[in-house]
A protein has these predicted regions:
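Conserved class I S-adenosyl-L-methionine
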Residues: 139-149
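S-adenosyl-L-methionine
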Residues: 180-202
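Conserved beta-strand signature within the Rossmann-like core of class I S-adenosyl-L-methionine
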Residues: 232-243
């Protein structure tokens, strides 16, 4: 029997609600002096637990504290992402082999033309398509990613391109989870792991950041700018404006003004009001600036 659209939505909602769980307060490692939004809640705690304990690794993506930071793409946004693939001339099914929605028990939805999928996986694939649209092939690139989640974006890039190296830049706890995730999907060979304290100034072919750079305080942004951003031939930075005033975070316009060849594009699909994409070193275009 073919289920109607409304019933499928209800079933997805119930399944996802069943997956959702909360981290016990006794396990919290939340920082009292955060330098980024990801340090405000229990995000670092669940990263650490998932990197060390099979029980938590199997379900970390459905933890409420983790979803508040990373796993927040819903079914409606999933369909908008599929439409974005088509606007760029690709069928979303070409990227299905890159998805690992079976790891970490993420929320999943029935998305037209994509199937039963984690929309977060769709977003990572859409970003790969955008990268290849404006920069061409990523083969032989040395890539650095600022703020790496569980390694989902980097994992898909490593699986789809023959890069020279892929540097994951983040705090110790997320990096521990990334190592475990990449081991699970067999993509550790070209991965490099760097904490902010160990960051070295040096040339990169491409730097990317999905929101994370824009969620840092200004002091940390300046460090990243000096050591990574200014040293990168190309850049792809998705930017939001949600940090509290005390962070004194650069706006996207200020950030772009410090990179002579940069351009600002609309984020497509728009995940939050005011979000934009800042790029430089590109030869292709994604549409309207």
């Amino acid at each position: 029997m073919k289920l109607n659209k409304e019933l499928i939505i209800v079933i997805d909602r119930l399944r996802n609600r069943k997956r959702l769980w909360n981290l016990p307060k006794t396990l919290s490692l939340a920082s009292n002096n955060p330098e980024s939004l990801s340090e405000l809640d229990d995000y670092l705690t669940i990263c650490k637990l998932a990197s060390q304990d099979d029980k938590f690794f199997k379900k970390f993506r459905s933890c409420s504290s983790y979803r508040a930071i990373l796993e927040n793409v819903d079914g409606k946004s999933g369909l908008e992402l599929v439409n974005a693939f088509e606007r760029l001339g690709k069928d979303v099914s070409e990227f299905r082999h890159l998805w690992h929605g079976e790891i970490g028990a993420p929320y999943k939805y029935h998305v037209k033309r994509a199937g039963y999928v984690s929309p977060t996986e769709l977003r990572y694939s859409k970003i790969i398509l955008e990268l290849e649209t404006i920069f061409g092939s990523l083969n032989s690139y040395s890539i650095s990613e600022i703020g790496v989640g569980f390694g989902g974006q980097g994992g898909q890039i490593l699986a789809s391109s023959n890069v020279k190296s892929y540097e994951f830049i983040d705090l110790v706890e997320p990096l521990g989870l990334v190592k475990r995730y990449l081991k699970e999907i067999q993509q550790l060979d070209k991965a490099v792991f760097t904490t902010p304290n160990n960051l070295q100034k040096g040339r990169r072919d491409l730097v990317i950041s999905n929101y994370a750079f824009s969620e840092l305080n200004r002091e940390l942004q300046e460090s990243y700018f000096e050591k990574v951003i200014s040293q990168s031939t190309r850049g792809f930075i998705i930017y939001n404006h949600i940090t509290p005033p005390k962070y004194k975070t650069m706006t996207a316009t200020e950030f772009a003004s410090r990179i002579p060849t940069s351009e600002i594009f609309s984020e497509t699909p728009l995940s939050y009001p005011g979000n934009v994409l800042v790029t430089w070193g590109h030869t292709g275009s994604l549409g309207d600036e």
